[in-house]
């Protein structure tokens, strides 16, 4: 199943707090990181391991380590930055690729203004992080970009997803797994997720949120 709605009690509890309109920027930012870490745990459960040895207190010990090249985390600017530290708290050695996409508020289409990808993507697991999967345009554009650069294993982590966005991603890229804390009702006329979290970028960075 390519869509994973993580219904762990901690995820449900933290997401419920994040839906509060009166939540402070500090709390929203911290909870974004915490939920991102929990999503990372789920998204990394089947990562390949390789045998290794280390020197322990009583001699050589056989252990296991993550096989292959380091993971790359791909935050979609700007809101994806709010989830980055949560992923890095579990995978501190991960490389970071940065993608800048802006959505045209009239057409709801995404256009790229920044692309900074790490090398050897064909040998890395790419974890895209973006709090909101709404229309799916930004996510599809990012996956397109990663695949053009050679990425073969891509997973998307998002706090809240709309069915419309999930469908758009899977129609374009059925091989990509989506991990989300919640599949919400759908999009309103402005393309925002309902009930959603509001504008995640504004809530993470403390900028003024537009209210329709």
From Swiss-Prot:
This is Uracil phosphoribosyltransferase. Allosterically activated by GTP. It comes from the Bacteria. The gene is upp. Uracil binds at residues 193, 198-200. InterPro entries: PRibTrfase_dom, PRTase-like, Upp_B, UPRTase/APRTase, Ura_phspho_trans. The lineage of its organism: Bacteria, Pseudomonadati, Pseudomonadota, Betaproteobacteria, Burkholderiales. Catalyzes the conversion of uracil and 5-phospho-alpha-D-ribose 1-diphosphate (PRPP) to UMP and diphosphate. It comes from Bordetella avium (strain 197N). Belongs to the UPRTase family. One of its GO terms (molecular function) is magnesium ion binding. Pathway: Pyrimidine metabolism; UMP biosynthesis via salvage pathway; UMP from uracil: step 1/1. It catalyses: UMP + diphosphate = 5-phospho-alpha-D-ribose 1-diphosphate + uracil. Its EC number is 2.4.2.9. GO terms for biological process: UMP salvage; uracil salvage. Its cofactor is Mg(2+). Binds 1 Mg(2+) ion per subunit. The magnesium is bound as Mg-PRPP. 5-phospho-alpha-D-ribose 1-diphosphate binds at residues 78, 103, 130-138, 199. Keywords: Allosteric enzyme, Glycosyltransferase, GTP-binding, Magnesium, Nucleotide-binding, Transferase. Gene3D superfamilies: 3.40.50.2020. It holds the Pfam family UPRTase. CDD domains: PRTases_typeI (cd06223). The keyword Cell inner membrane does not apply.
């Amino acid at each position: 199943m390519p869509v994973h709605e993580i219904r762990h009690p901690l995820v449900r509890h933290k997401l419920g707090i994040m839906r509060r309109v009166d939540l402070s920027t500090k709390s929203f930012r911290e909870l974004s990181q915490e939920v991102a870490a929990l999503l990372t745990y789920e998204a990394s459960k089947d990562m390949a391991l390789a045998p290794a040895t280390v020197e322990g207190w009583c001699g050589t010990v056989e252990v296991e380590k993550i096989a292959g090249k380091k993971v790359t985390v791909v935050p979609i600017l700007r809101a994806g930055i709010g989830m980055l530290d949560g992923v890095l708290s579990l995978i501190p050695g991960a490389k970071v690729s940065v993608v800048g996409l802006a959505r045209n508020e009239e057409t709801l289409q995404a256009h790229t203004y920044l692309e900074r990808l790490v090398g050897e993507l064909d040998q890395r697991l790419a974890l895209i992080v973006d709090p909101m999967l709404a229309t799916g345009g930004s996510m599809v554009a990012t996956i397109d970009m990663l695949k053009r650069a050679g990425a073969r294993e891509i997973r998307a982590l998002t706090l809240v997803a709309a069915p419309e966005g999930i469908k758009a991603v899977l129609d374009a890229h059925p091989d990509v797994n989506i991990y989300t804390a919640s599949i919400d009702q759908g999009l309103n006329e402005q393309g925002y997720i309902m009930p959603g979290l509001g504008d995640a970028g504004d809530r993470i960075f403390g900028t003024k949120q537009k209210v329709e």
